[in-house]
Amino acid sequence: MLKLIKCELMKLKRKKFIPLVFLSAFLFPVPITFLMATPRMLERYPNKTVLFDGLFNMVMGYGVIFLLPCVIGVIAAMLFFMERDNDTFKNLRTIPVTSTQMIMAKIIVLFIFGVIFCLASMFATVICGSFSMEIHGLAYKLLVAIELGIFITAGTLPVVVLVVFFSRTYIFSILLCVFYSVASLTVETLFGTLPKWLCWLLPIPLTTLWGAGDMVKHGFPLNVAALEKIIPSTFQTVFILGIMAVISISLIDFLYKKSGE
């Protein structure tokens, strides 16, 4: 399996898109840092320590939540379209590797990039915040970044199913992921009116609720009093996303085998 993962990483290494993944980690921290430095925003935070918590929450809770599904979708399209574009499905049948093993290697690579992107976004936030804020609590923020990388990637797998199913162009895959991110953010603005089961059924809003609740437990200045009844525990979040991931991977495996026939 490690050799398969290494092989998939080597394939992506040839793509010029990958360096952009790391650069995109600065896409939200930089403008949000300037936004946090405005007098109107400074009035909301009593000191520079709390201000940094606010910056971290906005970057991870809005920027990463929006951008990472798009990044995962594009990388997934690259991974799953390579064999189709190069017409190598027949060649793959001659090697002693099952399609399920190949699928798992590709999925693991998606999770690796999901975690890397979140860690890069976290470090970008630290770098930007260090100029005007007091940096603290890095151990917890590091843990949250890793968890968000795993959770958001798992929550994006249903979209990967659609990417593999339609098997269209990269542009179509990007548009599909952008629509998914926008739809998720739209749902998040309706948390107060939507039923609990619907909020938990949608992966990205579920992750957002978990992140907000977990950050509040660790002293972040977030007003989530109106959402207390629908905030899931870590166990509930892992359980729900785990079921979604298993179903999605099974569907991806089925569709991938079918496309190779």
Task: Locate predicted features.
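Aromatic- and glycine-rich beta-strand/loop motifs that create alpha-glucan
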Residues: 1-26
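Alpha-helical transmembrane segments of multi-pass membrane transporters/permeases
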Residues: 20, 167-182, 186
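Hydrophobic core positions of alpha-helical segments in small-molecule transporters
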Residues: 20-24, 104-105, 173-176, 240
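Secretory targeting signals
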Residues: 24-74, 104-170, 227, 231-234
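Terminal transmembrane helical anchor/hairpin motif
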Residues: 38-55, 174, 182-258
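Transmembrane alpha-helical segments in integral membrane proteins
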Residues: 68-84, 89, 159-171, 240-258
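Helix-loop-helix units of permease transmembrane domains in multi-pass membrane transporters
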Residues: 78-111
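Hydrophobic alpha-helical transmembrane segments of integral membrane proteins
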Residues: 99-122, 189-207
